Amino acid sequence: MSNNQKRLSIGLMIALVGFPQISETIYTPALPNVASGLLASVHSVEATLAIYFLGFAIGVLLWGTISDWCGRRTAMLMGLIVYGIGTVGCANVESVESLLAWRFLQAFGASVGSVITQTIIRDSYEGAERTKIFVVMSGALAFSPAIGPLLGGFISEFFGWRANFWVLALLSIVLGIWSFVSLSETRPNHHKRISAVKIYLLFRDMMRSRALWGHILLISATNGILFGFYQEAPFVFIEQLGMQPSHYGLFGLLIATATMLAARLSHQLNNRYSSQHLIQCGAMCVFLGGSIFTLIVGMGIFNVKMVGVSIAVLTLFVIFFGIGLIIPNSLSHALKPYQMVAGTAGSIFGGCYYFLITVFTWAMSVMHNGTALPLPFYMTMLGLVLACGSQMIRFPQGMAEKC
């Protein structure tokens, strides 16, 4: 336990780690309306999600290093200002090209909530306590994307898709004031600013780590599945099956329930089983769930509304339960060898997996063909990526038993 722990507001940490995911998913129920409102193609509208992750990846690469130089608190406040400007821009666009540009800026600012929050937690907690806090954060990461489509479905249905961005602009103001008043500096007093040469050497060392690449695959594939679902599912369930946006938003509750139950179970099992074993179980759940989902769509069962949707709900529950087992256990172990340069290492780690998320979500937009099959097939393929990642990670002897 660090001395910084006493000054750390868990409520604020949950809000800061959650708002980027809310920003990503809040307008997904309105994607068909965005396409028609801006006279844009489905592929270009879905690209607004991929561009979000590109901006996020670049932001993650920079904010951690900035926080090592000027402090966690200053970096967080700067990022929230950029996020607010980008969000207001999104609310006033008249073309999909403008939306792409403002979404990039919005994501660049929002990324501060991900990388700096994780760095603050690593500054403030150690060992098993850190793992438990990451379990709590994983629950927030699971629930915050669920809030997005649930809230966004109602907002879009009654106020239009632009209203989603005005809600996010208000959120940026609230978080900015809360952070200014409550967020304390957690950068260690003995922390030394890292030079450009040392950043390069750190990057080279991290890129040579097989275990770290395993964690990069785990985090990027789990998020790729989550946001690929939010990207493609509106066209499957709203356009093809005729769901109302507000009803579609309930899928967020399904995802949140599955991942939070898994995170809770992981919290209880960490004293009995290694994190690596739990990650492997999670990867198996994702692959099996995706395979069954693909099978029912391929056999045409999915087109029978009640039967198909019911089976899809069950398979999605299994998939996101598996994701809930993977994320907290991977995040808590990924950067343990780089504790003294947590901000910069977190930037490199986060930048790598967000670039992969960009690739995955772009692939989902390319796979879109007007049928339901690309979504489950995409999930199954990423299940294989998770299986590979779970085999690449290695924890030191004795450490797993304590986690």
For the regions a language model picked out, list residue spans one by one.
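Juxtamembrane intracellular "pre-TM" segments in multi-pass secondary transporters
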Residues: 1-2, 184-215
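Extracytoplasmic
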Residues: 8-42, 63, 229-234
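Helix-breaking motifs and short loop linkers at transmembrane-helix boundaries and internal kinks
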Residues: 37-39, 71, 92-98, 109, ...
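Conserved MFS/SLC helix-loop-helix module at the cytosolic interface between two early adjacent transmembrane helices
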Residues: 58-97
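Structural signature of the two symmetry-related core transmembrane helices
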Residues: 74-89, 277-293
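Paired small-residue
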Residues: 82-89, 97-105, 310-315
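Helix-loop-helix hairpin linking two adjacent transmembrane segments in secondary transporters
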Residues: 98, 135-181, 250
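Cytoplasmic helix-loop-helix junction between adjacent transmembrane helices
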Residues: 102-143
